[in-house]
Amino acid sequence: MEGGAAACPEKGIIMQTLVIGFPRIGTLRELKFASEKYFRGEIGAQELLQTAAQLRKIHWSTQRNAGIDYISSNDFSFYDMTLDTAVLLNIIPKRYKELELSGLDTYFAMARGYQGASGDVKALAMKKWFNTNYHYIVPEVEDDTVIQLSGNKLVDEYAEAKALGIETKPVVIGAYTMLRLCRFTGKKPALDYVEDIISAYQNLVKKCEENQIAWVQFDEPSLVLDMDDSDKALFHQIYDELLAVETDTKVLLQTYFGDIR
């Protein structure tokens, strides 16, 4: 868990605080054990979702009680935030959709694979997250993938915290980093999807405004990697168009693991 605060008494400036990456598994590994029970068929989806909601409540309350100024939401995940963002953007390969499972089980099929009455598919590949020991699920973009805003996880978890009297800023992996993390399995290169992903993030910001969300945080750790002129041009294109949207919701750009190149 990272975060911090600093003050400069001479100038009367007090810096505000946030946490980058609050642990989601639970102090007693509640998420791990509940998920394993679900996979074994010992509990249903509703009980798993209740465990998740209880953990989110604890995590938000812990930060509020610690005096954190900008508490995050949408940082909870059953498996991986990259996979969460892929689902949010409708980046779901056809072989998983064809299983015709529930949204939750389709998500887990992408993360763990699925062998059952509906079919037999392997999980998506995993890679090291920016050379750390954490591994993320690699999203697959097919030629007929339509990248667009899909699902309500982000606003639902914001509303969940709001109902507890806790104001939050939703967090999502940013568009530039998502393009860098995806694997493009067809003939189309990443650049063919730039306008679609910009449109999806524009709609995300608009949806935040519709739900009276003051801040949304985009995580862009790919900015700490070496960037050539084309990379820099792509980043500027994405954010020039994204920030051109007239909205009351403010965008917080977050990086980690190093300095912006």
What is each PLM-predicted segment?
Residues G3-G4, G12:
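Residue-identity detector for glycine
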